[in-house]
Amino acid sequence: MNGIDAVVLATGNDFRAVEAGVHAYASRNGKYSSLTHAKIENGIFTFWMEIPLALGTVGGLTGLHPLVKFAMELLHKPSAKELMQIVAVAGLAQNFAALRSLTTTGIQEGHMKMH
């Protein structure tokens, strides 16, 4: 969720609402389940994420806060749908990096470099 929250915050959206929605979605079947999925089919590795997102690109802070305006320009002024795709990809990329760390050196080694 760190990557997701970062993009949501940078674009002036409500990260608390996104967090609540995603966590509710992850537990929709009575137990907490993964938001990301992976498979290998016909030699092709597929990694995807399913999350509920309701994000905006107009109104609110998008036209008022200079850093939000900059973030939206940096992202080439995406539509709401495109922004949701960007946010999901950020989350997926972060999850993929975490899986790599877990299957190689471990999460702790990477975090210890920060201290």
Go through the PLM ranges and name each one:
Residues 1-67:
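Glycine-rich anion/phosphate-binding loop at the beta-strand->alpha-helix junction
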Residues 37-115:
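Catalytic-core signal marking the mid-to-C-terminal active-site face
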